[in-house]
Amino acid sequence: MKDLSKEIEQVIKGVQARKVILQTLLEGVPKKGSDLRRALADAFDRRINGVSDALIYFNLQALENAGYIHSYREWKDKYAKLNPEWIQPLRNYFRVIAPITCVGFIGDDPRVHLQLRMKFKLNRQFRPEKFLFFTSSRMRGRIAGFFDNVKVEFIQDNYLFDYKTVLKIIDEHIRKILPTHEVIIEVGHGTRFCSMALHKISLQYGLKSFYLTDDDQIIWIDE
Protein backbone atom coordinates (compact mmCIF):
# COMPACT_ATOMS: atom_id res chain seq x y z
CA MET A 1 0.00 0.00 0.00
CA LYS A 2 1.54 3.28 -1.16
CA ASP A 3 2.36 5.91 1.47
CA LEU A 4 0.79 9.19 0.34
CA SER A 5 1.85 11.27 3.35
CA LYS A 6 4.18 13.54 1.39
CA GLU A 7 1.57 14.18 -1.27
CA ILE A 8 -1.02 15.02 1.38
CA GLU A 9 1.40 17.40 3.10
CA GLN A 10 2.02 19.19 -0.20
CA VAL A 11 -1.71 19.82 -0.55
CA ILE A 12 -2.27 20.87 3.07
CA LYS A 13 0.86 23.09 2.99
CA GLY A 14 0.75 23.51 6.74
CA VAL A 15 -2.60 25.33 6.57
CA GLN A 16 -4.48 24.44 9.75
CA ALA A 17 -7.87 25.20 8.20
CA ARG A 18 -7.33 22.50 5.57
CA LYS A 19 -6.44 19.98 8.25
CA VAL A 20 -9.60 20.82 10.18
CA ILE A 21 -11.78 20.57 7.07
CA LEU A 22 -10.33 17.18 6.08
CA GLN A 23 -10.62 15.78 9.60
CA THR A 24 -14.22 16.98 9.83
CA LEU A 25 -15.07 15.34 6.50
CA LEU A 26 -13.51 12.10 7.78
CA GLU A 27 -16.47 11.82 10.16
CA GLY A 28 -18.19 9.98 7.32
CA VAL A 29 -21.06 12.21 6.26
CA PRO A 30 -21.22 15.18 3.87
CA LYS A 31 -20.86 18.53 5.63
CA LYS A 32 -22.58 21.83 5.00
CA GLY A 33 -20.71 25.11 5.10
CA SER A 34 -22.22 25.78 8.54
CA ASP A 35 -20.81 22.46 9.82
CA LEU A 36 -17.33 23.37 8.62
CA ARG A 37 -17.64 26.88 10.04
CA ARG A 38 -18.49 25.41 13.44
CA ALA A 39 -15.56 22.98 13.27
CA LEU A 40 -13.15 25.78 12.33
CA ALA A 41 -14.51 28.01 15.11
CA ASP A 42 -13.92 25.23 17.65
CA ALA A 43 -10.42 24.54 16.32
CA PHE A 44 -9.39 28.21 16.36
CA ASP A 45 -11.29 29.04 19.56
CA ARG A 46 -13.32 31.72 17.83
CA ARG A 47 -16.94 32.71 17.71
CA ILE A 48 -18.93 31.32 14.77
CA ASN A 49 -19.06 34.75 13.16
CA GLY A 50 -15.29 35.00 13.53
CA VAL A 51 -14.80 32.42 10.76
CA SER A 52 -15.05 34.19 7.43
CA ASP A 53 -16.62 32.85 4.26
CA ALA A 54 -13.30 33.47 2.53
CA LEU A 55 -11.44 31.19 4.97
CA ILE A 56 -13.88 28.36 4.35
CA TYR A 57 -14.31 28.58 0.62
CA PHE A 58 -10.72 29.42 -0.31
CA ASN A 59 -9.51 26.27 1.44
CA LEU A 60 -12.40 24.17 0.16
CA GLN A 61 -11.52 25.26 -3.36
CA ALA A 62 -7.86 24.34 -2.85
CA LEU A 63 -8.82 20.87 -1.64
CA GLU A 64 -11.31 20.42 -4.47
CA ASN A 65 -8.74 21.49 -7.07
CA ALA A 66 -6.36 18.88 -5.63
CA GLY A 67 -9.03 16.19 -6.07
CA TYR A 68 -9.46 15.46 -2.36
CA ILE A 69 -13.06 16.60 -2.05
CA HIS A 70 -16.01 17.51 -4.18
CA SER A 71 -18.90 19.82 -3.42
CA TYR A 72 -22.49 19.78 -4.56
CA ARG A 73 -25.68 21.66 -3.90
CA GLU A 74 -28.96 20.32 -2.56
CA TRP A 75 -31.73 22.88 -2.66
CA LYS A 76 -30.28 25.91 -0.83
CA ASP A 77 -27.44 24.12 0.95
CA LYS A 78 -23.98 23.40 -0.40
CA TYR A 79 -22.24 20.25 0.82
CA ALA A 80 -18.68 18.95 0.73
CA LYS A 81 -17.54 15.34 0.96
CA LEU A 82 -14.29 13.44 0.52
CA ASN A 83 -13.57 11.68 -2.75
CA PRO A 84 -13.48 7.93 -2.01
CA GLU A 85 -9.91 7.53 -3.29
CA TRP A 86 -8.64 9.75 -0.49
CA ILE A 87 -10.65 8.52 2.49
CA GLN A 88 -8.30 5.76 3.67
CA PRO A 89 -5.04 7.60 2.84
CA LEU A 90 -6.31 10.56 4.89
CA ARG A 91 -7.30 8.25 7.74
CA ASN A 92 -3.78 6.87 7.70
CA TYR A 93 -2.27 10.37 7.61
CA PHE A 94 -4.33 11.68 10.54
CA ARG A 95 -4.19 8.32 12.35
CA VAL A 96 -7.96 8.04 12.44
CA ILE A 97 -9.16 4.57 13.38
CA ALA A 98 -12.37 3.35 11.77
CA PRO A 99 -14.23 0.05 12.22
CA ILE A 100 -13.12 -2.57 9.72
CA THR A 101 -15.08 -4.34 7.00
CA CYS A 102 -13.41 -7.33 5.36
CA VAL A 103 -14.37 -7.85 1.72
CA GLY A 104 -13.73 -10.96 -0.34
CA PHE A 105 -15.14 -13.51 -2.76
CA ILE A 106 -16.56 -16.95 -2.10
CA GLY A 107 -15.56 -19.29 -4.91
CA ASP A 108 -16.06 -23.03 -5.09
CA ASP A 109 -15.21 -23.44 -1.41
CA PRO A 110 -18.21 -22.10 0.55
CA ARG A 111 -16.29 -22.22 3.84
CA VAL A 112 -14.14 -19.17 3.09
CA HIS A 113 -16.35 -16.84 5.12
CA LEU A 114 -16.06 -19.11 8.16
CA GLN A 115 -12.29 -19.46 7.76
CA LEU A 116 -11.76 -15.72 7.56
CA ARG A 117 -14.06 -14.96 10.43
CA MET A 118 -12.29 -17.45 12.70
CA LYS A 119 -8.85 -16.30 11.55
CA PHE A 120 -9.55 -12.66 12.39
CA LYS A 121 -11.18 -13.60 15.67
CA LEU A 122 -7.68 -14.55 16.84
CA ASN A 123 -5.97 -11.55 15.22
CA ARG A 124 -4.94 -8.78 17.62
CA GLN A 125 -4.31 -6.11 14.99
CA PHE A 126 -7.37 -6.50 12.77
CA ARG A 127 -10.80 -7.30 14.17
CA PRO A 128 -13.35 -6.77 11.40
CA GLU A 129 -16.72 -5.52 12.56
CA LYS A 130 -18.36 -6.70 9.34
CA PHE A 131 -17.70 -9.05 6.44
CA LEU A 132 -18.94 -8.60 2.88
CA PHE A 133 -18.56 -11.42 0.38
CA PHE A 134 -19.42 -11.60 -3.29
CA THR A 135 -20.23 -14.90 -4.93
CA SER A 136 -21.92 -16.50 -7.91
CA SER A 137 -25.71 -16.73 -7.98
CA ARG A 138 -25.31 -20.51 -8.38
CA MET A 139 -23.95 -20.61 -4.80
CA ARG A 140 -27.33 -19.51 -3.44
CA GLY A 141 -28.49 -22.20 -1.04
CA ARG A 142 -25.02 -23.80 -0.84
CA ILE A 143 -23.61 -21.38 1.71
CA ALA A 144 -24.58 -21.74 5.35
CA GLY A 145 -23.42 -20.75 8.80
CA PHE A 146 -23.72 -16.99 8.40
CA PHE A 147 -23.39 -14.74 11.41
CA ASP A 148 -25.17 -11.41 11.77
CA ASN A 149 -22.07 -9.47 10.73
CA VAL A 150 -21.66 -11.39 7.45
CA LYS A 151 -23.36 -10.15 4.28
CA VAL A 152 -23.32 -11.88 0.89
CA GLU A 153 -23.99 -10.26 -2.47
CA PHE A 154 -24.82 -12.65 -5.31
CA ILE A 155 -23.58 -11.86 -8.83
CA GLN A 156 -25.21 -13.45 -11.85
CA ASP A 157 -23.02 -16.28 -13.04
CA ASN A 158 -22.68 -14.95 -16.59
CA TYR A 159 -21.24 -11.67 -15.24
CA LEU A 160 -18.34 -13.34 -13.43
CA PHE A 161 -16.30 -13.55 -16.62
CA ASP A 162 -16.91 -9.93 -17.56
CA TYR A 163 -14.17 -7.96 -15.83
CA LYS A 164 -15.73 -4.51 -16.26
CA THR A 165 -19.10 -5.63 -14.92
CA VAL A 166 -17.59 -7.36 -11.89
CA LEU A 167 -15.43 -4.31 -11.18
CA LYS A 168 -18.44 -1.99 -11.37
CA ILE A 169 -20.57 -4.14 -9.06
CA ILE A 170 -17.89 -4.46 -6.39
CA ASP A 171 -16.83 -0.82 -6.71
CA GLU A 172 -20.37 0.42 -6.05
CA HIS A 173 -20.46 -1.49 -2.76
CA ILE A 174 -16.99 -0.37 -1.68
CA ARG A 175 -17.87 3.28 -2.24
CA LYS A 176 -20.84 2.91 0.12
CA ILE A 177 -18.72 1.34 2.86
CA LEU A 178 -15.63 3.57 2.74
CA PRO A 179 -17.03 6.70 4.43
CA THR A 180 -17.65 4.80 7.69
CA HIS A 181 -15.32 1.77 7.59
CA GLU A 182 -11.77 0.85 6.75
CA VAL A 183 -11.96 -1.85 4.10
CA ILE A 184 -9.48 -4.72 3.91
CA ILE A 185 -9.66 -7.05 0.92
CA GLU A 186 -8.97 -10.75 0.41
CA VAL A 187 -7.96 -11.17 -3.23
CA GLY A 188 -7.24 -14.88 -3.56
CA HIS A 189 -10.62 -16.47 -4.21
CA GLY A 190 -13.17 -16.45 -7.01
CA THR A 191 -12.65 -16.23 -10.75
CA ARG A 192 -9.58 -14.60 -12.25
CA PHE A 193 -11.60 -11.50 -13.09
CA CYS A 194 -12.95 -11.26 -9.54
CA SER A 195 -9.44 -11.38 -8.09
CA MET A 196 -8.30 -8.78 -10.61
CA ALA A 197 -11.21 -6.50 -9.72
CA LEU A 198 -10.61 -6.80 -5.98
CA HIS A 199 -6.90 -6.10 -6.43
CA LYS A 200 -7.56 -3.06 -8.61
CA ILE A 201 -10.00 -1.67 -6.06
CA SER A 202 -7.48 -2.11 -3.24
CA LEU A 203 -4.95 -0.09 -5.24
CA GLN A 204 -7.45 2.57 -6.32
CA TYR A 205 -8.61 3.33 -2.78
CA GLY A 206 -5.36 2.71 -0.93
CA LEU A 207 -6.69 -0.32 0.95
CA LYS A 208 -4.85 -3.17 2.64
CA SER A 209 -5.13 -6.45 0.76
CA PHE A 210 -4.17 -10.00 1.60
CA TYR A 211 -4.30 -13.60 0.45
CA LEU A 212 -5.72 -16.49 2.46
CA THR A 213 -3.64 -19.61 1.79
CA ASP A 214 -4.91 -23.18 1.61
CA ASP A 215 -3.65 -23.78 5.15
CA ASP A 216 -5.52 -20.69 6.45
CA GLN A 217 -2.52 -18.38 6.70
CA ILE A 218 -2.95 -14.69 5.93
CA ILE A 219 -0.32 -13.16 3.65
CA TRP A 220 -0.51 -9.38 3.44
CA ILE A 221 0.27 -7.87 0.05
CA ASP A 222 2.72 -5.00 0.35
CA GLU A 223 2.53 -2.73 -2.65
What residues fall within each predicted segment?
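Long, low-complexity, Lys/Arg-enriched
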Residues: M1-E182, F193-E223
